[in-house]
C-alpha cells in the first residue's frame, strides 16, 4: 500500500478495536504518537507489514489492550522505545515482534503476568541485543508461557560484603525486585562474601534451598540463622 497521509489529528478516543489498522501499509510513516489509545482493547496486527513505520508511540496508553498479537510483525523499520507501555491487561503477545528486524529496545518493565500466549514473540527479531534479551528474560521468564531460554544473556548485580545484607533484606521485603536485581536467592554468587553474621536472624519464614552457595571465603557466620524456629534447609 502507498498510503502515507497525515492522520495525526484523528480523534480515536472512542475506538476500541484497531486490529489490522495499518496491515500491509508499507509506506506509512506518519506521527500518531499523540493518539488517545485509552479505549482500545484490541490492536492485533496493527502494524503488520508496515515496513516503513518508525515514529514514536511510547506515550500511548495501552492499559486496556488485551490482545497484542502480531502488532509489529514484519515491521522491519520500527525501533522506538515502548518500554513504558502498561501491558498488564494483555493476554496475547504471540508473534508480536516476529521479523521486527530493527527492534532493539528494553521491555524490562513490562508486566506480562496475565499473558497466556507468547509463542514466537521475538522470532527472527535479529536486531535485539544480547543485553536487552537478558533484561527481557529476567522480567518475562517468571511467566511459565515464556518460550525462550535467554538465561545466558542475563546479568545480575554482584553480591559482596557491601550489599549482601541489603540483598537479603530485599528478598524478604520485595522478592520480585530482589530476583530481578540479584537473581533467585538459591542461585546467588556469594563467593566474594566474607561476612554472613546474623544474615537471616529472626527470619522465621525462610526455607529456601541455598545449599549450592559457595561460602568458601566466609570467615564470619555466627548467628546466621538465629531465630525461635530452626530452618529446614541450610
What are these regions (language model features)?
Residues 228-234:
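A short, hydrophobic C-terminal helix/tail in secreted or cell-surface proteins
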Residues 1-227:
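Negatively charged
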Amino acid at each position: 500500500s502507498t498510503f502515507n497521509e497525515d492522520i495525526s489529528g484523528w480523534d480515536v478516543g472512542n475506538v476500541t478495536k484497531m486490529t489490522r489498522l495499518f496491515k500491509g501499509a508499507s509506506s506509512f510513516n506518519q506521527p500518531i504518537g499523540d493518539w488517545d489509545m485509552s479505549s482500545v482493547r484490541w490492536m492485533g496486527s496493527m502494524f503488520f507489514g508496515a515496513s516503513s513505520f518508525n515514529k514514536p508511540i511510547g506515550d500511548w496508553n495501552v492499559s486496556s489492550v488485551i490482545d497484542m498479537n502480531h502488532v509489529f510483525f514484519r515491521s522491519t523499520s520500527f525501533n522506538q522505545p515502548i518500554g513504558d507501555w502498561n501491558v498488564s491487561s494483555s493476554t496475547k503477545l504471540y508473534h508480536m515482534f516476529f521479523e521486527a528486524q530493527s527492534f532493539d529496545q528494553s521491555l524490562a518493565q513490562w508486566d506480562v503476568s496475565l499473558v497466556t500466549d507468547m509463542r514466537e514473540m521475538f522470532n527472527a527479531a535479529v536486531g535485539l541485543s544480547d543485553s536487552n534479551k537478558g533484561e527481557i528474560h529476567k522480567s518475562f521468564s517468571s511467566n511459565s508461557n515464556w518460550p525462550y531460554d535467554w538465561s545466558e544473556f542475563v546479568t545480575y548485580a554482584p553480591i559482596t560484603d557491601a550489599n549482601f545484607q541489603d540483598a537479603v533484606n530485599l528478598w524478604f521485603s520485595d522478592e520480585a525486585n530482589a530476583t530481578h536485581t540479584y537473581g533467585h536467592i538459591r542461585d546467588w554468587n556469594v563467593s566474594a562474601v566474607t561476612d554472613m553474621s546474623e544474615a537471616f536472624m529472626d527470619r522465621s519464614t525462610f526455607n529456601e534451598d541455598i545449599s549450592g552457595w559457595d561460602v568458601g571465603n566466609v570467615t564470619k557466620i555466627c548467628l546466621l540463622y538465629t531465630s525461635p524456629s530452626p530452618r529446614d534447609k541450610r
